[in-house]
């Protein structure tokens, strides 16, 4: 449990954590940070050191209260009017799960939405919505964001790890264990030398170099 304790402390202190799912799934390592602590410099680190897609994961309960749907469900609805879409919709990914993608958003005060400061603003504002979801979060969401945007929202499975073992659920479980606002930024770590995902061994080297906790999915499942 030491690795989990270190990861929880890092998240509470506004630092990064690395999460490896498993060799039997994506076999990828994601860079993870609590949305409430995100700053523009953190976005820069994620896009340069990790290099994958910067996404914001939120729990299924909050997504439901915001009337957010999974992207494949939205596309299914749209395909009634655009039949060609039905052939493109991916309900099951190659690694065996339904994708957790929902819509993309920008905060209304952003310009293009893609800059480090714009993305950090969008993420922090969405974290604020999640923190007051039972007060005026739903109203704030519709007033303060526009879509499409540059932050990809991910919706966690309703039963979290009982239902799905992706980085979305793993990071949400860890953020819940840390008693932080239930919104977490995740980004896949890529390898520019191999053009593939960064191996666990290389992620471990990075972890030690920058003193960032690296945890396995099995450790999170045992919380």
Kindly label every feature range from the protein language model.
Residues 1-223:
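Catalytic domains of riboflavin
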């Amino acid at each position: 449990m030491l690795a989990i304790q270190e990861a929880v402390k890092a998240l509470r202190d506004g630092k990064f954590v690395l999460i490896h799912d498993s060799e039997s799934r994506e076999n990828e390592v994601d860079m993870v940070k609590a949305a409430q602590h995100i700053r523009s410099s953190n976005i820069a680190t994620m896009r340069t050191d990790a290099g994958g897609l910067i996404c914001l994961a939120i729990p299924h309960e909050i997504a439901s209260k915001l009337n957010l749907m999974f992207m494949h469900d939205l596309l299914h609805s749209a395909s009634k009017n655009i039949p060609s879409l039905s052939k493109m919709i991916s309900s099951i990914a190659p690694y065996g799960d339904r994708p957790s993608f929902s819509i993309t958003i920008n905060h209304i005060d952003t310009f293009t939405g893609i800059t480090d400061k714009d993305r950090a603003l969008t993420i922090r504002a969405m974290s604020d919505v999640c923190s007051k979801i039972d007060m005026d979060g739903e109203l704030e969401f519709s007033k303060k964001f526009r879509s499409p945007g540059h932050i990809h929202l991910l919706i966690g499975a309703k039963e979290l790890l009982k239902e799905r073992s992706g980085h979305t659920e793993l990071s949400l479980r860890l953020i819940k264990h840390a008693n932080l606002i239930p919104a977490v930024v995740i980004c896949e770590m890529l390898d520019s030398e191999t053009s593939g995902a960064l191996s666990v061994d290389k992620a471990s080297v990075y972890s030690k170099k920058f003193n960032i906790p690296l945890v396995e999915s099995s450790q999170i499942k045992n919380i």
